[in-house]
Every structure is written in C-alpha cells, then in structure tokens.
Design a protein with these regions (language model features):
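Zn-dependent metallo-beta-lactamase
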Residues: 1-39, 44-47, 178-192, 201-207
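Core dinuclear metal-dependent hydrolase active-site scaffold
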Residues: 11-14, 26-32, 38, 128-157
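Metallo-beta-lactamase
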Residues: 45-46, 55, 59-82, 97-141, 147-207
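Metal-dependent catalytic neighborhoods of phosphoester/phosphodiester hydrolases
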Residues: 85-91, 204-206
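Short hydrophobic/aromatic-enriched beta-strand-loop microsegments
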Residues: 94-99, 162-165
Length: 207
C-alpha cells in the first residue's frame, strides 16, 4: 500500500539557547498525517538552574496558542532537556522513544533534566529498533548524538523527508557524515532533513 500523499511537516520555534557565544534556535516539528497529528520533540516550557548558562529564551507551545489537544502522538528523538521539556503538556498521550534512550535518561547522571523526563502522567512507549508508526511514517534508530537517538522518516513521494532532531546539529555534519546515524540518514537519500537547531531544512548538495 502506498503512503498517503498528504503528509506535511511544519517547524515551530519554541526557544533560543546560547551556545559558543551565539544564539541557537530550538524547533519542534508537527507532522500532519491523514490518520493523526504527530509532534516530534516538545522543546522547553520553563527555566532550570542546570541550563542557566545557556540563557534560554522561551516561547513554549502552551504560550503560543498552539492546539495542544490536537496532538495525538508525540515522538522524542531523544531526551536531552531541550527536546523533552514540554512532555508534561501531553500527559496521557503516547510518547514514542527508543528504549535505550529512555534507559540512559533514567540512569545516567547529567544526561538530562530528569524531572522533565519523569513528569507526572507522561506515558512513554519504548521502541526497540525500527517501527512503522503510521502508514508512511517510520521511526529509525540513528545513534551518534546519543546512543538512543531516533529520527522520523516521512514517505511523501519519490524521496523521503526526515525529521532528524539532533542527528546533526549543523548542516556540515550531513554534508560530511561521520556518525552511524548521519550515515544512515544519508543512505535514505532524503529530499530534505529538518533539524532542531537550524532554521531551514538541510538539502543534499547539487552538482
């Protein structure tokens, strides 16, 4: 069966962080699928002393007039603080994350802000490897930035679109891939890759 043609990806800026002296955006991504509305990562909703040195400037989903109730499924690419800080807004709804990522976030010190991961009512669905989330929507492990990082592959036509989280932090990491995850994403021959900390999607260089 062919994937639906009407799957769209929309980036939403939810924060800025100070990294190496420059402001770095934080985006989450909404995937509108005929069968469900999927949110990839949840950004941040509050400040925390553990990341005060990054001078977060927040514009969380719940302050943007975003339709929180309209989200059916949440995917965490990984559980660093700037990707899971809004998980509590979706308490009771399924949040898909790789089991290894969840285990690391729960057991390793200084990995994340643990109270954000373990917010009351948050319901994780641990994933082991690849998973077809919906027709035309796949979760694929892409280790590198973290051991349990995953990306979302959207089959929209001849070539897929990837929502990659931090599989790469900047475009050069996909231009010249090194990690297992980056190599795996490039092997998909994607049309474009949305990243958390870039304003525009990465596209393959044309000769």
């Amino acid at each position: 069966m062919n994937a639906p043609a009407s799957i769209t990806v929309t980036p939403i800026r939810v924060a800025d962080l100070l990294a190496e002296g420059e402001r770095m955006p934080v985006y989450v991504h909404v995937i509108d699928h005929p069968d469900a509305r999927v949110l990839v990562d949840t950004g941040m909703t509050e400040l925390h002393p553990a990341v005060a040195d990054m001078d977060p400037r927040l514009s969380p989903l719940n302050k943007q007039g975003f339709d929180l109730a309209g989200i059916d499924i949440v995917v965490n690419t990984h559980l660093h603080f700037d990707h899971c800080g809004g998980n509590h807004l979706f308490a009771g709804r399924p949040i898909y994350v790789q089991r290894r990522e969840l285990d690391d976030a729960r057991s390793e010190d200084d990995y994340t802000i643990r109270e954000w991961v373990e917010a009351p009512g948050v319901r994780y669905v641990p994933v082991d490897g690849e998973l077809e989330l919906l027709l035309g929507l796949r979760l694929i492990p892409a280790p590198g930035h973290t051991r349990g990082l995953q990306v979302v592959v959207v089959e929209t036509g001849d070539r897929p679109v990837v929502v990659g989280g931090d599989v790469a932090v900047w475009f050069g990491e996909l231009d010249e891939p090194h990690t297992e995850g980056q190599l795996r994403v490039r092997a998909l021959d994607p049309e474009l890759v949305w990243l958390t900390h870039e304003h525009e999607p990465w596209r393959p260089r044309t000769v």
